[in-house]
Amino acid sequence: MEFIKPDEVKLGEMKRIRFGTKADLWTGEADAEVAAKGLTHPADTYSLNGSLVGNAWKLTFRNGDESGTLNLPLPAKMLRYAADIHDGRTKPGYPEPVLYKEWRFEGEVKGTGFFKAGIVARTKYFLVFQGRGNSCDTAEDFTHWRLNITGKKADYTFHGELSAPVRDKENK
């Protein structure tokens, strides 16, 4: 586990990451209306379009005719986490274990549309990309994501899958 400043290599991999087309609102056993403080007209599932645009993750959520966008500026440092979870998985032809990996980002969030009412000063985001791979990080390693939004008027969590990353040549 280490805090790192994203270098050009990590930024290049981040630019290749694409969010899947669906985001689920985590509600536990509560109804969406109760579990999503600060989210106007919450739903269990949203359509989603998201990627790194400039120096911010831009995620646009849609539910029917309603939409909202979350802008998550890249922090100066991110947390890179990798662990051997001793499940015996290895990559064919390689002796080392396949690691469980996370990239974690935290910062202040900005929101529009159905997010706007709950996003006030100092509202925070916590974004996690999850996956498996060797000790070298690539966009292909990450398959799932989780996003928590917390603040004075907001408290909700989304999760979902990542789409296949953009090929390296398409990203330039």
Where are these regions (language model features)?
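Cysteine-centric segments in proteins
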Residues: 1-172
